[in-house]
A protein has these predicted regions:
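Gly/Ala-rich beta-loop-alpha elbow adjacent to hydrolase catalytic centers
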Residues: 74-75, 79, 83
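Glycine-rich His-Gly loop
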Residues: 7-10, 76-77, 102
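Conserved HGGG/HGGXW glycine-rich cap/lid loop of the alpha/beta-hydrolase fold
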Residues: 2-43, 64, 72
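Active-site loop/oxyanion-hole signature of alpha/beta-hydrolase fold enzymes
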Residues: 30, 36-72, 88-89, 112-117
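Flexible "cap/lid" loop of the alpha/beta hydrolase fold
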Residues: 48, 88-135, 160-164
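Hydrophobic, aromatic-enriched alpha-helical segments typical of multi-pass transmembrane helices
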Residues: 1, 14, 23, 33-34, ...
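Active-site signature of alpha/beta-hydrolase-fold catalytic machinery across serine-
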Residues: 19, 85-89
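Conserved alpha/beta-hydrolase catalytic His-Asp/Glu region
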Residues: 129-165
Length: 165
């Protein structure tokens, strides 16, 4: 069977995969869904220094620590930018990349490179409501049904602006 590493998007954590993981495991797959530094249950680590490279190293570190090879690396939303950085660093460990509702950057690109308008809006949000360095979550990101909507609202956390730059 396959080994999956599921990388969540901005404002989220490994919690967003909890309804998917049982299906993958029931099919006999090995599944890892780490929470990126400073987010969700790791929100106490949130700081202005956390950037995209921090999150790339979170995943590279997992692959090395667990000695994973032949990995199917899934990136949702912002996680797509993270997995692109991961495959740049350890391509020999990755079998497939799956971009799930995400941006698909070229090697070395960040969100600032892909969408200058979005990054400008995020900077404005950080200045207005996030002490100049963090972006607070907004809404439920398309989740409209209860109890999932309430679950998302309880679970999302602030995201460092530097992760998009």
């Amino acid at each position: 069977m396959a080994t999956f590493v599921l990388v969540h998007g901005a404002w989220f954590g490994s919690w967003c995969w909890q309804k998917i993981i049982p299906f993958l495991k029931a099919a006999g797959h090995e599944v890892y869904a780490p929470t990126l530094t400073g987010l969700a249950e790791r929100a106490s680590e949130l700081s202005p220094e956390i950037g995209l490279d921090t999150h790339i190293q979170d995943i590279v570190g997992l692959l090395l620590e667990k000695d994973l090879h032949g990995v199917i690396l899934v990136g949702h939303s912002y996680g797509g930018i993270v997995i692109t950085g991961v495959v740049d660093q350890v391509p020999e460990r990755i079998a497939h990349l799956v971009y799930l509702d995400t941006f698909v950057p070229r090697n070395g690109e960040s969100m600032a490179d892909i969408s200058p308008l979005v990054i400008r809006l995020l900077r404005q949000q950080a200045q207005a409501h996030g002490d100049g360095w963090k972006i607070n979550p907004r809404g439920t990101y398309g989740v409209t049904r209860e109890p999932d909507r309430s679950w998302v609202l309880r679970s999302v956390t602030a995201q460092p602006l530097k992760t998009f730059e």
